[in-house]
């Protein structure tokens, strides 16, 4: 992928295709790169190259994901497409490819299918902010009424999972026709309409630097004559000298004031999202803070023990468990920088969980962690990853 020709002046948005197997997600991805490449807005990536996506490791889990990029007049898009259903589930739960918006692909010939429903539910659970719909294979349906029926079904399904089904743009077309006739204005109209819908409907994400300050603590040092320094990578926002901050998690929340910020031994006025910094804290002893806590803007995040989550349990082949587990299972939950033991309670009617399953369950931790909806974690047994999850709701 030639990086030079992309101007980074345009705002950047992350998207991905979701939908049932064989409804045309990968064909659409290829068609978009082909059609847009003719206008210099993308490099054409062929279907075969997207379909045999390389496997990547994210939190110890192997996920096959294809990444393509393209532009519209207004934006630069990074777009992910996964070859298999299991890859989608893992991708969305681990947040390996964070999505600011999703392109739901539904075959007009089949209408919504089980994985259509599952992907919409997952998008809702993991907090994908918005969805646009591409109704594919419309060339295979002669009956206008049938197309309308499928559209209504899709809108109903989106409403069921609390997406605004009545307002979501649904673009009709054929990805295959567009891919095979990339210069045909009529057959590629749907691709340009989709891009327009993405520009107009998917909101631009808030930049990490504009969010309230948060830094997971990785290490704690005592510097004689100066006090206690905690180090870590700023996850979001900025931190300045004289800022009042809170230390959240594991024990009672404490307030303190930043008396110094340094990076690579140099003194800074402020640290911002992405920086690895040392933060000097007023009146805090080395024993008052520990790895696993976070520094945060006061009131922006609170500690919790009980939450609901969506989790994927690794297969034996992925290095996970060899046997099922039941309600009352007590693994460690690795949040940001530390493990905390917790108890899993399975949903009613669920007897047990097999390796390879994805589940919704309740967790009760033995210590509180600074937590919010959308926080990712790994499930571990003695340092070995056996699952991955995302907080979908805080209970207390």
UniProtKB/Swiss-Prot annotation:
GTP binds at residues 19-26, 81-85, 136-139. Keywords: Cytoplasm, Elongation factor, GTP-binding, Hydrolase, Magnesium, Metal-binding, Nucleotide-binding, Protein biosynthesis. Mg(2+) binds at residue 26. Its EC number is 3.6.5.3. Residues 174-176 are annotated as: G5. It is found in: Cytoplasm. Residues 136-139 are annotated as: G4. Transmembrane segments: none annotated. Pfam families: GTP_EFTU, GTP_EFTU_D2, GTP_EFTU_D3. Monomer. This is Elongation factor Tu. It comes from Flexistipes sinusarabici.
């Amino acid at each position: 992928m030639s990086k030079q020709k992309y101007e980074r002046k345009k705002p950047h948005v992350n998207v991905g295709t979701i939908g049932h197997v064989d409804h045309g997600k990968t064909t659409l991805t290829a068609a978009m790169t082909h059609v847009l490449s003719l206008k210099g807005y993308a490099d054409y990536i062929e279907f075969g190259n997207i379909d045999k996506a390389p496997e990547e490791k994210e939190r110890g889990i192997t996920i096959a994901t294809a990444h393509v990029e393209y532009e519209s007049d207004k934006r630069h898009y990074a777009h992910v497409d996964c070859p298999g259903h299991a890859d989608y589930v893992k991708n969305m739960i681990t947040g390996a490819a964070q999505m600011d918006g999703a392109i739901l692909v539904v075959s007009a010939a089949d209408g919504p299918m089980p994985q259509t429903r599952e992907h919409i539910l997952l998008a809702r659970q993991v907090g994908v902010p918005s969805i646009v719909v591409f109704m594919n294979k419309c060339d295979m349906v002669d009956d206008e009424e049938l197309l309308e029926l499928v559209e209504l079904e899709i809108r109903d399904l989106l409403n069921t999972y609390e997406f605004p089904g009545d307002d979501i743009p649904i673009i009709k077309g054929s990805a295959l026709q567009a891919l095979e006739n990339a210069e045909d204005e009529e057959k590629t109209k749907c691709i340009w309409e989709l891009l327009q819908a993405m520009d107009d409907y998917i909101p631009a994400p808030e930049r990490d630097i504009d969010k309230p300050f948060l830094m997971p603590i990785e290490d704690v040092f005592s510097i004689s004559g100066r006090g206690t320094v905690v180090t870590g990578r700023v996850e979001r926002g900025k931190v300045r000298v004289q800022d009042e901050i809170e230390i959240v998690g594991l024990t009672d929340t404490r307030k303190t004031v930043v008396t110094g910020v340094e990076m690579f031994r140099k003194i800074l006025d402020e640290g911002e999202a992405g920086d690895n910094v040392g933060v000097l804290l007023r009146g805090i002893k080395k024993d008052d803070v520990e790895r696993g806590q976070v520094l945060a803007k006061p009131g922006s995040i609170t500690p919790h023990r009980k939450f609901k989550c969506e989790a994927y349990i690794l297969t034996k082949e992925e290095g996970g468990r060899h046997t099922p587990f039941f309600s009352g299972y007590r693994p460690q939950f690795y949040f940001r920088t530390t493990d905390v033991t917790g108890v899993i309670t399975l949903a009613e009617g669920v007897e047990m969980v097999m390796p390879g399953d994805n589940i919704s369950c309740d967790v009760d931790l033995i210590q509180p962690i600074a937590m919010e909806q959308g926080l990712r974690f790994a499930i571990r047994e003695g340092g070995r990853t056996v699952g991955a999850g995302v907080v979908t709701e805080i209970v207390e």
